[in-house]
């Protein structure tokens, strides 16, 4: 289906006349030269289709023309309309400019970097901003203003946003209001037509109840867009979604199956739902690339544009995906037509089996479904050997010269609605499942709330136990601060002397011989036996013991000062290692005045370890509470799956890379939101592991991971000075931030290594 605009259009990127391509996700029309750059960016940046030679749903084409005619291009070129930008030398590309590097650099800056999009004045909290934008989108889709919704989506609004008060998504609102074009735009940006509302009703149900039957049918097509597109690529047909949702072609010579093909099919069936969905989406993107390649070669007519630089030989890299997945996506281009068709048939069959809930069948039951090994396949071109004599009027688009009609007749379509389950029963079951899932989510939220309340009560109990034990102790003499003459005894006798007074303690801070251990610490823990709990008025909400050092009391070498260092018994400062006990015991035995023995500490005897110094620095900002609980009780030997740990590690690494880019670009105002994202990713990764892991390497790695994440937050908050105009040493701060990020990455790598090793054993 094709349609031209009512007026002469120009390319949105270089103003060339009569553009032949459309960017669906950007709502603009582009010429052939600019389209070659769009295709090289990938579908995650720009989804392109030819206006005349590609198959278009009528409402989708109408949506693109509406956006293009209403000035959607001004969204992506907002700052270029400012006269100040013209004076600075930044300009739009011209039709006479070369594709590389002028047009390509401009298009990348425009769509990939979003260099010309209007920026919001305040982006301190991206989460709150995205939520507000999504709520605006939720309200705007009931109207017919497409440009406003596209602008909100470009600023970060979520198409699948679930409104907490109204219990619906934007697609529910658009379907109820009958806004077909708004629904098309939302689906392009990832809205799910099958997502239930708070009552389990989908946007399709909303459209039908409101009497918008054509919109409901279109939403059903969007729900099965992936399988419909794969089937249409093979045989040129789509299911009508009334008698069935799947058309599964089969190879005419599929009875000749090898053992390798049967084994490959079993591997496909053994994939988890998430991995199978990722594979299906990657094959969908490869189908789109091959169809656009066919259109490109057919329309260029071997002109100068058909060059290596304008071709897209494989799927471009998507930075949101892992390196392994990107490599697998690119290897799909190496499949010849026969291999690729066999893979598509297997995916269609497996998708149908999974959605209908059928059990796995033996390979002999479905001889037409297989995955071919590349070494066992011949070099036949497409499906010429099984082409039919029937002719169609479709125009040739394949580079091999074979027509889509021949390919359609070379396949036998399977039944559209086999199986004992009727469509009505399936829809009822799906609705009941959606309702059950909504109830499960609600119960999970209630459970989480109760768990938080239980943890709070446990902290209160520990606090009361500590106060009770303190009140039961016999009263002792209250130590008084020493006189200045007495404090003088703590200073060295000579400035250059190397003799240190090691037999004195800090005044009124530590009570020697105290054996109070409410947490059941190890008997040999020297530091715990030297701590006395403060009065209840000095206790923090989440900490029972703290080493309270008055400001300026100790001056540690290299300018590190300790003001308040709260910790729990599970923190690294309370470990039973001799090194940590020796270093910490020195802290309790030294200095009582402004001039303490720390100023003369020998270089060969470090006062605190590196980890201890980091905890002291962290204590200057806020209390630190490690995520690991006390190790009282049974230890849990269980470990999460290696796949889950690697997935969370990639998320942590991605957020760290974003932070490092901000540091390289001197965007210090981005430190705080980046650190929040890293902390969230670290929390999700730590939640994979048991509360009391049995392996000591796992416990130490988790402590380092959580401690570094908290310290990173503390360091990043220093970018905002406590008083306006106060100087901030950004160079030193950046070094501290990079060090924290390194510690987080190191701990995450250790957890991946440990998990992989333990799973192999």
Swiss-Prot record:
Record's keyword annotation contains Kinase: no
Region (Interaction with MAPK1): 411-466
Residues in ANK repeats: 132-161, 166-195, 199-228
UniProt-annotated stretches for the region Disordered: 354-416, 471-501, 572-606
Residues where Phosphotyrosine is found: 224, 383, 545, 554
Region of interest: Interaction with ARHGEF7: 254-367
Region listing for Interaction with gamma-tubulin and localization to the centrosome, in residue ranges: 1-124
Modified residues (Phosphoserine): 359, 362, 370, 375, 385, 388, 410, 413, 417, 498, 536, 561, 571, 592, 596, 630
GO biological process: brain development; cell redox homeostasis; cellular response to epidermal growth factor stimulus; cellular response to lipopolysaccharide; dendritic spine development; ephrin receptor signaling pathway; immunological synapse formation; intramembranous ossification
Segments of this protein annotated with the region Interaction with PCLO: 245-365
Cellular localisation: Cytoplasm; Synapse; Presynapse; Postsynapse
Record flagged with keyword Protein transport: no
Region (Interaction with PTK2/FAK1): 253-415
Region (Interaction with PXN and TGFB1I1): 637-761
PROSITE patterns hit by this protein: ANK_REP_REGION, ANK_REPEAT, ARFGAP
Post-translational modification, as annotated: Phosphorylated by PAK1. Phosphorylation on tyrosine residues may be catalyzed by PTK2/FAK1 and SRC in growing fibroblasts. Phosphorylation at Tyr-383 is induced by activation of Ephrin-B1/EFNB1 and catalyzed by SRC family kinases. It is required for the interaction with NCK2 and for GIT1 recruitment to synapses in hippocampal neurons.
Biased composition (Acidic residues): 385-394
Protein purpose: GTPase-activating protein for ADP ribosylation factor family members, including ARF1. Multidomain scaffold protein that interacts with numerous proteins and therefore participates in many cellular functions, including receptor internalization, focal adhesion remodeling, and signaling by both G protein-coupled receptors and tyrosine kinase receptors. Through PAK1 activation, positively regulates microtubule nucleation during interphase. Plays a role in the regulation of cytokinesis; for this function, may act in a pathway also involving ENTR1 and PTPN13.
Cited PANTHER family: ARF GTPASE-ACTIVATING PROTEIN GIT1, G PROTEIN-COUPLED RECEPTOR KINASE INTERACTING ARFGAP
UniProt name for this protein: ARF GTPase-activating protein GIT1
Protein source organism: Homo sapiens (Human)
